[in-house]
Amino acid sequence: MINEVKSDAQSRMDKSVEAFRSQLSKIRTGRAHPSLLDGIMVPYYGSNTPLRQVGNVSTEDARTLTVTVFDASLIKAVEKAIMGSSLGLNPMSAGTVIRIPLPPLTEERRRDLIKIVRGEAENSRIAIRNIRRDANNDLKLLEKDKDISEDEQRVGEELVQKTTNDHIKQIEDLLVVKEAELLEV
């Protein structure tokens, strides 16, 4: 039973780390990366569709992304969606290809992005701690119902704490790497 509680907590913590990793990929660094445009939705036949479903996003060079739109009638809508995003990008179309030059990040913008990244990291740490709390409560309930002994409860809590520490360390490692990327000129 302890292993079930621990494995449930572990899988939920893994999802929190993965969600943090996904959030980081959407925050712009100095380099062009196709995942930068993942959050952009394009109006297509009356519903919002992810950009990746209406075109192919690729990297042309270190500072330029290209979007090859599958349907030429969507070029204006894709450009408008990219301009309307909070990324501060100005797309230029050439036929069915849209080029998106990435302006260099200013020092002030880098500092703002680092604050955002740190906030996301803190939210992920809080989520992981909440999962730990839930797992410890489950262990206490098992002990209260006499399904496990007090010693087994303590051992279970130690296992959950170790898992929590491992996942918070993963968050910290991802944070350090992203901050270094943002500060790189």
Curated annotation (Swiss-Prot):
Entries under Gene3D superfamilies matching the protein: 3.30.1360.40, Ribosome-recycling factor
Short name of any one Pfam family annotated for the protein: RRF
Subcellular location: Cytoplasm
Membrane-spanning ranges: none
BP-aspect Gene Ontology terms: cytoplasmic translational termination
Superkingdom as given in the UniProt entry: Bacteria
A GO-annotated cellular component: cytosol
HAMAP family: RRF
Protein name in UniProt: Ribosome-recycling factor
Source organism of this protein record: Psychromonas ingrahamii (strain DSM 17664 / CCUG 51855 / 37)
Protein encoded by which gene: frr
